[in-house]
Amino acid sequence: MPSITGLTAAEVEARRAAGQTNQPPKSQTKTTGEIVRDNVCTYFNLVFLVLAVMLALVHSWLNMGFLGIVFWNTLIGIVQQLRAKRTIDKLTLVSAQKLRCLRDGQWCEVLSDDLVQDDVVEFGAGDQIAADAVVLDGSAQANESLITGEARAIPKECGAELKSGSFLMAGRCVARLTRVGAESYASRLTAEAQADGHRVARGEMMRSLDKLIKFIGVALIPIGAVLIWKQHWVLELSMKETVDATVAALIGMIPEGLYLLTSVALAVSMMRLARRKVLTRDMNCIETLARVDTLCVDKTGTITESTMQADDPLPLAENTPITEILSAFYAGGQPDNDTARALTARFGQGGTAWAAVRTIPFNTAYKYSAKDFGAQGCYVVGAPDVLAGSRAGELADRLTPLLAQGRRVLLLAKYNGTLPDPPAALDPAQLEFLALLPLQNRIRESAPKTFRFFAKQGVKIKVISGDDPQAVSHVAANAGIAGAEHWVDAATLQSEAALAEAAEKCTVFGRVTPEQKRQLVHALQAKGHTVAMTGDGVNDVLALKDADCGIAMASGAQAASQVAQLVLLDSDFAALPGVVAEGRRVINNIQRSASLFLVKNIFSFLLSIVALALPLAYPFQPLQLSLVTFATIGAPAFFLALEPNHELVHGKFMRNVLRKALPGGLTDFLLVFCAQGFGYAFDIPSDMVGTICTLVILCVGLQILWGVCIPFTPLHWAIWGSMTVAGVGGVFLLARWLPLVRLDLGGTLVLVVLLALSAPTLAGLVFMGERLHGMVNDWKNKKARKHV
């Protein structure tokens, strides 16, 4: 290495003072101020404030009780998200990329965020380039597909530029950082994308909630204005009665707890995953996890342990100093993958003094590494079937038994030709086969149990590896993966159509290139599958990035950890069932809780529209709805969101929620409308009609909660029982403040009739909804079969 000097401590401090640090322009998590602002300064909190002012102006102090719920909702949201932020920030620091940096003449490890401009840094295979740099020494091959989309190895020699966001596929080099932080290439690309309006895609659930919130937000203002006009100037109610009724109607239409529950549930889920040593880089991936039906895994580091052991070489030629050749080949090197590390540990300690005049580092594209020792000869180590090519039959008798044992096998050969520049496939005719180098990984003890879990959950496993397909198939079968006997050599899949067909039919894929891994992910996604991809190597980066959910092992290549949405900090594949179960738990419970919230919103919206069209006043006061909301929606939804739920999520979020919420919302609307009709027909006082309506929707709400709690568990019994006591107890204890009035004989008869009708009405609407849902699904299935 030429004389290279790094920065001194004083120079580092000077650059920090000048702001020339590699700090990212924006933190991965929100700041404390952003969390407080986003929870306090919301559109609906502004609406609640305006409604409270309206109530204050007419001295309706008791009906301002909903502000207490708003306050506690906001406080809970802030506290939970701050807790999640602290946990995620700690894990982010633990998982941050560390690089070798030359400072004060000494090599030391420095976090990528702590680098400064002009730092001298060493990059190896699997490292992501942390900032723009220029190569000072060494040679490597970079992949810039993450920033340019072009998936090819680009040689980087002395003087070449390294772009931030790219990663090294092979080799090792020393470089000086030229542009850091916001000035780097990757940061400028991100800033331009944000300036053009591009944002990280939100999950289907959050997009659905955003649309619902926007619709309600737009509808509130005209409905509220017309309600005030109708009730005060047309029905000639007093201003206090008008404001009370209008505020109640608008509060009924606002899903005040739904968005909060969703945000808090996702934040808590990130925190729960963090406690399991799983770093979540993107909150949206939690929703994706709940929908995963296909899991793509690598063999090494996932099914097997990441560390490999090199066995004794099997000579193929007589009187050849195999150990001496291997000692020279691996002596003094810096291995950049598990295979090289195992061979270096076994053979590279002897220190045979052969000087290499040219070195080709291993690359997944051509699957060999080579060293030219001049007079001592040129030697290559790589995949036997790839190197031997048309001569592979000469190795079959010795190679096949090893592959059947699940071994990884490399070929050591002498190359009598000239090494290609740039690296490319070698001429098999120029090879002298010297030895087979068998290596082995132990299957992780937890692997069979983990794969049984996924099989039980209906998740298909696809094993995608760069190794020989027969060897991978043997390992997969021993790990208990169903369909492991269905394997294919990806080298034979010469078209996208052939690869797409194999993606559906086969379980094990061997000799897969990094680009083919990505194509396999795309093929599975094109068939409608939600794909999670696990990996730890530089050859997994492209597939991890394009999978619906990329899951990286922290012990693997830094580039893999940087592009994945989830990082297993313990690098333990056994953690995955818990990760998937957490995703399903939170999304299923949010979906179930959302159906409770929307019942109130649906019936209140329909009732408001009817109140505008007919000579009927809105029958509720804000405090009455607050009691019903607490007992049948808010409190039970919170507790239901905490329990386990491992069911695979199917269908669209909003469609699923509306299918559950519409029967309840329509039941409330029909019964309340009937109560108003009876009141209008029999001249029942408005306060008595309001009491009847409150008791009716409380009863319907408890029936809906009963349906949600099926099948009943001790927790479900506790939730339903306590909410029933809270609702009924609130009616008796808070009647004076709600206000609820004593019913006369006519009012009592109306209440009894409506309560008697509530259960059959709800059951009938649920039955009709399920029948309609089934008919639509049958029609879709028939239509799909016609197109097959």
What is the role of each PLM region?
Residues 65, 96-210, 493-503, 507, ...:
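Cytosolic catalytic regions of P-type ion-transporting ATPases
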Residues 291-432, 439, 452-453, 461-473, ...:
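Cytosolic catalytic regions of ATP/NTP-dependent phosphoryl-transfer enzymes
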Residues 92-109, 116, 278-297:
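Membrane-cytosol interface motif
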Residues 46-68, 218-254, 271-277, 602-622, ...:
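Helix-interface capping motifs at the ends of transmembrane segments in multi-pass membrane proteins
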Residues 227, 266, 483-532, 547, ...:
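Membrane-embedded transport module
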Residues 2-6, 10, 16-26, 74-75, ...:
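Actuator/coupling domain of P-type ATPases
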Residues 21-101, 107, 211, 215, ...:
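Transmembrane helix-loop-helix hairpins at the membrane interface
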